Structure formats: C-alpha cells, structure tokens
Amino acid sequence: MERIKELRDLMSQSRTREILTKTTVDHMAIIKKYTSGRQEKNPALRMKWMMAMKYPITADKRIMEMIPKRNEQGQTLWSNTNDAGSDRVMVSPLAVTWWNRNGPTTSTVHYPKVYKTYFEKVERLKHGTFGPVHFRNQVKIRRRVDINPGHADLSAKEAQDVIMEVVFPNEVGARILTSESQLTITKEKKEELQDCKIAPLMVAYMLERELVRKTRFLPVAGGTSSVYIEVLHLTQGTCWEQMYTPGGEVRNDDVDQSLIIAARNIVRRATVSADPLASLLEMCHSTQIGGIRMVDILRQNPTEEQAVDICKAAMGLRISSSFSFGGFTFKRTSGSSVEREEEVLTGNLQTLKIRVHEGYEEFTMVGRRATAILRKATRRLIQLIVSGRDEQSIAEAIIVAMVFSQEDCMIKAVRGDLNFVNRANQRLNPMHQLLRHFQKDAKVLFQNWGIEPIDNVMGMIGILPDMTPSTEMSLRGIRVSKMGVDEYSSTERVVVSIDRFLRVRDQRGNVLLSPEEVSETQGTEKLTITYSSSMMWEINGPESVLVNTYQWIIRNWETVKIQWSQDPTMLYNKMEFEPFQSLIPKAARGQYSGFVRTLFQQMRDVLGTFDTVQIIKLLPFAAAPPEQSRMQFSSLTVNVRGSGMRILVRGNSPVFNYNKATKRLTVLGKDAGALTEDPDEGTAGVESAVLRGFLILGKEDKRYGPALSINELSNLAKGEKANVLIGQGDVVLVMKRKRDSSILTDSQTATKRIRMAIN
C-alpha cells in the first residue's frame, strides 16, 4: 500500500511524467537486451504496441493504385509515409479488411490439389467416429511411426527431383527421374498444377508432404498406422484413452499392410520349394501390389517385419541390425557373447545340440502386445522386466525369454519328444523346437522355474507360475512393470547375407532372421496382390491352379509346341507344372505320367496324329516321374471342388472344354484363352513336329507339281521333293530325307525355315 501511495504522489508531479515520457532509455544493458539479434524478445508486447499504431502493416507500393485512400466509413486506409528501410508503404489494419471484402478474387481450383493432404485429413476426421473416454493406466512405448498419412514412398532425393521438375521446371541442375513412380507422379502433378497461382515455395512444401514418408519416434499405446497417429493427441493421454475409428484409409497404410501379407505368403511358399532363395527372388520380382512392382516397394518402404526383411535381404538391401526370436524383436543394448556348440539333455533324455551364447548381455524385447528388458549370463536368466496388454501377452514374452536364456531348468522341463517340422517337413533347429514345445504348453516350465520373495518396488509387481500377479512372490528373476519398453529407435541399416534356406545373418555371422520367425497370421490384403509366379497359383486353391496351368500353356504355346517336339523332357520338368501335381491323386501320378508320355511319343512318331487340344489337355499330367506300365486310361482324375473330377483323354468335360467354333478353351467354366492356330488334326498346327524326316528347301517351286496335303507326304520316296500345304495355307518345298538319323534336328530347323520360307 505504502509503495502505491508513493508512486501516486510521484506521478502527480509534472516533472516525473516528463522524465518518464521524454527522456531516452540509455541504459546499455537494456538496449542490448532488446536490440541484439533478429529474434523478437517480447513478441506479445511488440504485437500490442504495433497494432496500437495507426499504420502497423507494410505493403507493396502498388497497393496505392489498388485500394482507395478511404473506406466507406471515411477511415484512412494507407499513409503516404514510406516504411523506414524499405520502399514499401505503411497501411492500416482496415486495409486488410477492405482487401478481403472488395479485393480481386482468384480461382480456387488449385487449392484442394496443392493442400490435398489437409483436405483429406479433414474428410477423415469428418467421417471418423470418436468413442467413449476410458480412464486407465496407459502402457505407452515409443515406436517409430509414420506421421504423414497419404504419402507416396519416395526417398528424399527422388522427391527433391520430382519437386524441382514440377515446381521449378526451368531451373538449372541435373534431374534424373528414373523410377516409374517418379515419372507417374511428375506427369500427374504437372497436369494438375497448370496455371497454378499459389506461391511456388508453398507448393513445394506441400508436395514434399505428399511424396515422402515422415517418421517420428513417439510414445504410442494402440494403433500405429498413420491414420491413428495423426489423432494421437486426441486418443491417448497419460491416464486416459479415447476410442477412435478413422474415417478413411490411406494408401501408404494399405501398402504397408499388403506388403507384409505378400511377403509372408512368398516366404512361406519359398520355404517348401527345392531352392528357397531362388524361388523367393523369382516371386518377389513377378509380384505386383496395387499395380506397383513389389521389388520397387521393397526398395522404398521402411516397414520392418520378419518376412519383409527376409525379402529385402534376398534383394541385397540393408535391414535393421536387431534380430527376431519367437515373434519378438531383440536388440542387444550392452554386453557381448561368444557362441559355442553344446549338447544338452531334455527332460525326456533327448540330446539337443544348441549354440550356447557365453557372456553377460542385456536386451530389449519388443513384440506387438508385450515388451521387456532382459539381462542374462551364460545359460542363466538374471532379470526380466515385462510389461504387456494382458496376462496372455505377458506369458508369451516370459516363455520366449526363458527359452532364449537357454537355462538348464527350461531344457529339463521338456516332456515328450521334440520333433517339430517346418512347412517343408524339415526339422526345426533346437532353439525353435524348444520354443514351439513351450508355446504349446508352458505349465511344467513355469512350475519348475522356481519362485522368490520380492521387495516392494514402485511400479513393479511379481507374477506367479499360474500367471497371476502378486506383491509377495514372483517367478525367479521375473517382474511385471507398468511401464513399457521403448522400441529400438535407431533407423540404422546393416549389410546382411542370406543363405539358400533364407537364414539372414549379419557380418559377424549371427542369425538375425529365419523363416521360422515368419508369422502364420493370415490376413486379407487391402490392395490387390498379383502373383504372376506359378509358385503362387495354389494360394487361391485348386481351381486357380488348374486354370492358371492351362492359361500358361496357351499363352506360351509357340515355345511349348517346339519343346514338345524337340526336347520333351525339359518341357516336362518345367516348374509351371509343379503346382498341378498336387491335384492328381498321389497313387495315379506316376501311371498317368507314363501313359501320357507314351501317347505323346506315338504322336511324334506317326505323321498326322498330332492333336493340339489333346497335347494342351494332357501336358500337365506328363510332369511327374513316369512309371512304365501298360495301363491305358480313357479319363484322368483331378481333385478340385472337394472331389475327384474327370478330364476325358478324348473329348470335352466340365473340367476341360474346347469349343471348336470359337477356338476358346474353358476350364471349370472359366475362360482360359484362345488357340491362335487351327488345331485341326489333318493339317496339324505344329509343322515342326509333322515335318520330321523332311528337309525344308524354301518357297514353293511350281516344277514339283501341285501342293500335297500333309497326309499325302508319307507316299514320297527318300530324296523325292514336293510342295506341301502347311498350317495357314502357306506352301513350302520339302525333300524327304535319305537318312533317318538326322530326323531330330529337322523339327528344330523346320520351325525357323518355315518362317523364312513363308516370309
């Protein structure tokens, strides 16, 4: 009170007022504080002070022609004084109001295109559904998440080239647009942004948002796809969560999801083939996801998932240095170990050869539903701190950690024999044998582990062998925590090697990934996955195998028919016929194959008995190793639609139906394509097969009389020449060979020579 009174007295004296308003502020420290550097020291004050002035805003001089001096109310809009230090004029805030109401309008057509990501976000939020708020402890763990929905997956460099090309096409500088996505996006954006008046820099920023994946390392409990991350601040706090369903999906999330499904399917299929690595590469290169080549997506997409990483490793791309075991991602945070082979006895006295890691190590374990910190020594678990969504998830993490520790009591807890096999019927390695065993039933493991009394530590509780929580006792070395363990944040990628059985190792030889680690979870892909490889035909069931096999023969008929006559064994061994074998009853495979191969040989030997449709129909049956038997068949059985269906050796059936009039083939009622040539037995389509034993001399020569039909050829004597009508009404001159030994080469040269003779 005293101070205020004193100030009042001072202010009543005119001298005080004069000192405060008229004298300069000349204390150097104060001047320095407020004038050094470009950074505004007190923005709020500055703003208030500026706006209190009559003309706080500067504008380009041209504004004087475009805006009246006074508005309708007679208030002055701009002053004649120039802005100090620039050639701009000072204007009133009222000028802005006038401009907004009466200024020139411009086309808004480009706004939704440039600010596409914002417009789409508004739509998603408009159609999203917010549910109730729940108050509960949130176990958040930091994960690397995509914060920018609706982007393409270009690298920063690729995006930079696209942006320069779209926004500043006339700037100098080498720009190389190589990838398909770069070219497509550039073309599309150039068309969209023709005559765009929005500031180029703004357009460039917005394009960057659309083209590049931006990731942040954020604490998340719940969904990690970008449409959930964009509302993270609305859906989870420290002690609450709000249910939310996004009002739309974005392509980048769909690509990530579909990529994982495609990769899992491919790895699973490759595992059971003769050469897994070669098959995997063949499938990755021939698969498309949402119309984009899978290999292009793999090169650009940073998704880290076991199957995806195996595919990347096979392509020679770098992957994360963490390793996977039991569906958890392990990252060593300290310590080191050396590997040594050791033989151990299970509780069933079965001998296992395990590679023991000797030394003290610490790991973080991160799974979909649980995370943990693990400290271990040689074959001993020292401490495991787990957190998870529920009892089940916590139990999964504990089992994986117990097996990983390689402790003796874990190995002794095995009851019964370990004989788990993978999809290719090969025995799993010992560590995965143990894992599968305890994942099936961990009762004995938990009972034998041992328990210990625990201290009361904030945020930690014990867990008993029956997986119930306790504050007094806990499984030895194991505690449950309320806090999650963060995912490994580094985006560092390392060079890895992969062997033909798809085991991925780092440069020190540690196994990071193997097909055993690939999840068996089946999902439905959001984008269409097109597997062109014959190895994936069976993914849609037996019918698809049947249709695809016949489609393949028809598509490749030109080369197939030449091989059929010249190198049948190579044709029979083609991998495209592999899936078909699973449709033929096991007992019949060898017999069918022997029968069909004999039939084909007769066709090759007897002129004019060639039958295109029959060859196409029976070819897949010749692929199995043949059994020599005298058996004849009038129909062959295939297992589709849950039962055996018959394919007639001569004639049509519901399974294989060739329509002579339309020249189209239908397999199980589905169109399998058209035969481009006339499969009429008389003038057989495969000239090369028919003209064995004849040498093609060239174009028609009238001196040798009228053209004979193929059937009349057999009457020629050795060395005799004749004109022959072949295929599509073309005539060529042939000579019957003097020796039979050279017959094999005929069909090879025949095909080439017919073409030359006709053309």
Swiss-Prot record:
GO biological process: 7-methylguanosine mRNA capping; cap snatching; DNA-templated transcription; symbiont-mediated suppression of host gene expression; symbiont-mediated suppression of host mRNA transcription via inhibition of RNA polymerase II activity; viral RNA genome replication
UniProt keyword Cell membrane present: no
Residue positions of motif Nuclear localization signal: 736-739
Cellular component per GO, a single term: virion component
Superkingdom in the source lineage: Viruses
One MF annotation (Gene Ontology) recorded for this entry: RNA binding
Compartments reported by the entry: Virion; Host nucleus
Alphabetical UniProt keywords: Cap snatching, Eukaryotic host gene expression shutoff by virus, Eukaryotic host transcription shutoff by virus, Host gene expression shutoff by virus, Host nucleus, Host-virus interaction, Inhibition of host RNA polymerase II by virus, mRNA capping, mRNA processing, Viral transcription, Virion
Annotated site, Avian adaptation, chain positions: E627
Disulfide bond positions: none
Subunit field text: Influenza RNA polymerase is composed of three subunits: PB1, PB2 and PA. Interacts (via N-terminus) with PB1 (via C-terminus). Interacts with nucleoprotein NP (via N-terminus).
Known role: Plays an essential role in transcription initiation and cap-stealing mechanism, in which cellular capped pre-mRNAs are used to generate primers for viral transcription. Recognizes and binds the 7-methylguanosine-containing cap of the target pre-RNA which is subsequently cleaved after 10-13 nucleotides by the viral protein PA. Plays a role in the initiation of the viral genome replication and modulates the activity of the ribonucleoprotein (RNP) complex.
Similarity section: Belongs to the influenza viruses PB2 family.
Protein name per its UniProtKB record: Polymerase basic protein 2
Protein source organism: Influenza A virus (strain A/Seal/Massachusetts/133/1982 H4N5)
Recorded name of the encoding gene: PB2
